[in-house]
Amino acid sequence: MTIEPWYWQAIEAIDYPFPQRMHPDIDWLEREIIAWSRTHHLVQSQEQINHIRAMLLAEFVARANADLRRPVLRLIGLWTVWFFFLDDLTDTISSVESLADFHLHILSATTESITHTQEHPLISAVADLWDELRQYAGPITQVRFYRAFVQTLEAHLWEVSNRTARVQPDSATYTAMRRS
C-alpha cells in the first residue's frame, strides 16, 4: 500500500498550529511490531512485513504518543497492529456466527490463565498482550480497558453483520451504536 500524492498535498495544506511531535524511537517501534507479529505467526512473508511498514502504524503510534516510555509505546503499537489483523480476518471469516464465536475465544484468552498456543495466532497474541497490559495497568485501568475492549468487539461484530447483510445504517443509527 502506498499513499497517493494527492493525500500528502491535502495533509500539507492543513494549517496545524501545534508543533509536530514524534516519539524518537519510531524505528525501534516498527522493529518491535514486526518481531512480535512474527513471533505470533501473524506474518509469514516479506510481503506481509512490507505491508505493515507501508501502513505506517509505527509512525501513527509514535506521533500520537510522543512522550511515553518505550514499553508502553510498544504495548500501544502491538494492540494497534493486533486490531488491524483482527479487521483483516473479517474479510475471510465464513459467517457472523463464526466471528462471534471467535470473539468469545478472544475474550476467554484475556480472562483465563491457560496457554493458547494451539489456537489461532490472534488468540495467542491477545493473551500475550493482556499479560503485558497487566504489567503496566492497575486493576481499575484493566477493568476500563476490558469494558472498552468488549464494546469494540461488539461494534466490530455489528459492523460485520451489517456488511454481510448488505445493510448500510444511516448516520444516526451508526452514531447511536458507536456511543452505546
For every predicted segment, state its role:
Residues 1-180:
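Alpha-helical, largely C-terminal catalytic domains
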